Amino acid sequence: MKRAILIVLDGVGIGELPDAAKYNDEGSNTLVNTAKALGGLSLPNMGKMGLSNIEEIPGTPKEDNPIAFYGKMAEASPGKDSTTGHWEIAGLILDRPFPVYPNGFPKEVIEAFEKAIGRKVIGNKPASGTEIIKELGEYHMKTGYPIVYTSADSVFQIAAHEEVIPVEELYRMCEIARNILQGEHAVARVIARPFTGSPGNFYRTPRRKDFSLPPFKATLLDYLKENNYDVIGVGKIEDLFAGRGLTLSLHQDNNSEGIKNIFEAWNKLREGLIFVNLVDFDMLYGHRNDPEGMGKALKDFDDALPDIMKLLSDFDLLIITADHGNDPTTPSTDHSREYVPLLIYSPNFKRTFPLGIRSTFSDLGKTLADFFNVKNDLHGESFLSTIEEGWK
């Protein structure tokens, strides 16, 4: 029986990539800089796995005999967003980044969208979703104009009050936007952001829905599903892959629910992969430049690790990595172009080795495809033979 849990700590990078300057990310190191800002960060369980052997994290000592294989991975695709990172982990490398809109969407996009939905839009700028409904919610209620906004990610977001634009109508608008946003403006995701409440007290409802660009060719998830493995997505995995290649999806509102979902997914897994995204590091702390929050979230995850590790049988795998950086100590509130950590654990490892610096996140996807013994056309170079040495 082959089983693996792959956990992506969203935004938890481990040092600038050689091309970081092109992205204005020189000096970014999410893990190390967070630890420095806090005067040290104790992550004993990831420490035992070899986290500080990748790059020393102040407060987490290096381990003489790490219980996991450890290394770091470079991103071969251009860009530094979640979709790019997760697709590359799953074996796809992009040749151009998804478009982002730091100054809002161009006139031709907005005009085409307004014409198609038969009403004007307001906003059209990068913004925090909670802030923009505070700012424009009342005007939206008076006019019925939907609020369009973006973020540092490649997203076209539409916010609307549920009593002004019913949710099904909002979803229809998102489908229209998805059809318009193709070619040079093919954003990774169009997102419906319904809200309710009254001026001064607006709040978002759980009926958010993502309209994602599907991966342009088969990913690890597709190959596993085709070969009758279970592929369970936890968190925003379903959104990032447009629902493709999954046999079940579990969603959550925060990391602690996400960790509970790992246990629920494990109980449902016969044989296959649980692919987990824990987003709080990025969404709540990286984008808000909150190193204290980032540190606490990392400690909370580290505290939960022993119970996750106890789930595994002798030849199961637990993999911990990230999709990009989001250094909370830099002036930027955007993602950062960083290496990501790579820790691979199995309870029956007799010995472990460094995995070095992998030239693409796809090495991980290729290795997992090999582990599950599925024929594939993924990018990357498998290091399964190295991992198998651990069981000998």
Curated annotation (Swiss-Prot):
Residue ranges that the Swiss-Prot or TrEMBL entry lists as coiled coil: none
Q: Which Gene3D superfamilies match?
A: Alkaline Phosphatase, subunit A, Phosphopentomutase
- CDD domains, per the entry: PPM
Annotated positions binding Mn(2+) 1: 10, 323-324
Residues that span the membrane, as ranges: none
Q: Which residues bind Mn(2+) 2?
A: 282, 287, 335
What are the UniProt keywords, alphabetically? Cytoplasm, Isomerase, Manganese, Metal-binding
GO biological process annotations for this chain's record? 2-deoxyribose 1-phosphate catabolic process; 5-phosphoribose 1-diphosphate biosynthetic process; metabolic compound salvage; nucleotide metabolic process
Q: What is its main location?
A: cytoplasm
Query: GO terms for molecular function, please?
Result: magnesium ion binding; manganese ion binding; phosphopentomutase activity
Report the co-factor binding details. Binds 2 manganese ions.
Q: What is its EC number?
A: 5.4.2.7
Cellular component GO terms, alphabetical: cytosol
UniProt cofactor(s)? Mn(2+)
From the UniProt record, list the reaction(s) this protein catalyses.
2-deoxy-alpha-D-ribose 1-phosphate = 2-deoxy-D-ribose 5-phosphate; alpha-D-ribose 1-phosphate = D-ribose 5-phosphate
* First-level EC class: isomerase
Where does the record say this protein resides? Answer: Cytoplasm
Metabolic or biological pathway:
Carbohydrate degradation; 2-deoxy-D-ribose 1-phosphate degradation; D-glyceraldehyde 3-phosphate and acetaldehyde from 2-deoxy-alpha-D-ribose 1-phosphate: step 1/2
Q: Which family does it belong to?
A: Belongs to the phosphopentomutase family.
Protein purpose = Isomerase that catalyzes the conversion of deoxy-ribose 1-phosphate (dRib-1-P) and ribose 1-phosphate (Rib-1-P) to deoxy-ribose 5-phosphate (dRib-5-P) and ribose 5-phosphate (Rib-5-P), respectively.
State what protein this is by name: Phosphopentomutase
